[in-house]
């Protein structure tokens, strides 16, 4: 019973990247999808309040207040303003003296 004395080791050119042929259709599609995903993610982060508010309420500015007394409308506006203030509250304003 003899032990193997030679070990197969890959040569340096086998360690190299085999994806140099970037004309492969799958590679091109993956790059395109990746770039598109990045652009959509950036737009979503920039405009998430506008997008989701529009999806929730449609093209109008908010839920309808038809038939609601003025006092309740004002109370609703105050709640909405307070909710917007709380939502923006995760940003820290540092004032230097």
From Swiss-Prot:
Topology Intravirion: residue spans: 44-97
Keyword Ribosomal protein applies: no
Domain of life according to the entry: Viruses
Membrane topology of the entry: Single-pass type III membrane protein
Regulation acting on activity, per entry: The M2 protein from most influenza A strains is inhibited by amantadine and rimantadine, resulting in viral uncoating incapacity. Emergence of amantadine-resistant variants is usually rapid.
UniProt-annotated stretches for the region Disordered: 58-89
Additional remark text: When the channel is activated, one or more imidazole moieties of His-37 probably become bi-protonated.
Chain's role: Forms a proton-selective ion channel that is necessary for the efficient release of the viral genome during virus entry. After attaching to the cell surface, the virion enters the cell by endocytosis. Acidification of the endosome triggers M2 ion channel activity.
Name the UniProt record assigns to this protein: Matrix protein 2
Protein family according to the UniProt entry: Belongs to the influenza viruses matrix protein M2 family.
Swiss-Prot/TrEMBL domain comment: Cytoplasmic tail plays an important role in virion assembly and morphogenesis.
GO CC list: host cell plasma membrane; membrane; virion membrane
Assembly information from the UniProt record: Homotetramer; composed of two disulfide-linked dimers held together by non-covalent interactions. May interact with matrix protein 1.
Cell location: Virion membrane; Host apical cell membrane
Glycosylated residues (UniProt): 20
BP terms from Gene Ontology: protein complex oligomerization; symbiont genome entry into host cell via pore formation in plasma membrane; symbiont-mediated suppression of host autophagy
Modified positions (Phosphoserine) in chain numbering: 64
GO MF, one example: monoatomic ion channel activity
Pfam families: Flu_M2
Lipid-acceptor residues (S-palmitoyl cysteine): 50
Membrane-spanning segments: 23-43
Site note Seems to be involved in pH gating, residues: 41
């Amino acid at each position: 019973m003899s032990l193997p004395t030679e070990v197969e080791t890959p040569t340096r050119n086998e360690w190299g990247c085999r994806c140099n042929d970037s004309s492969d259709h799958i590679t091109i599609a993956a790059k395109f999808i990746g770039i598109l995903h990045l652009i959509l993610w950036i737009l979503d982060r920039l405009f998430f309040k506008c997008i989701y508010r529009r999806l929730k309420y449609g093209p109008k500015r908010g839920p309808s207040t038809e038939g609601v007394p003025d006092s309740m409308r004002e109370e609703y506006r105050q709640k909405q303003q307070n909710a917007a203030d709380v939502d923006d509250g995760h940003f820290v304003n540092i004032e230097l003296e």
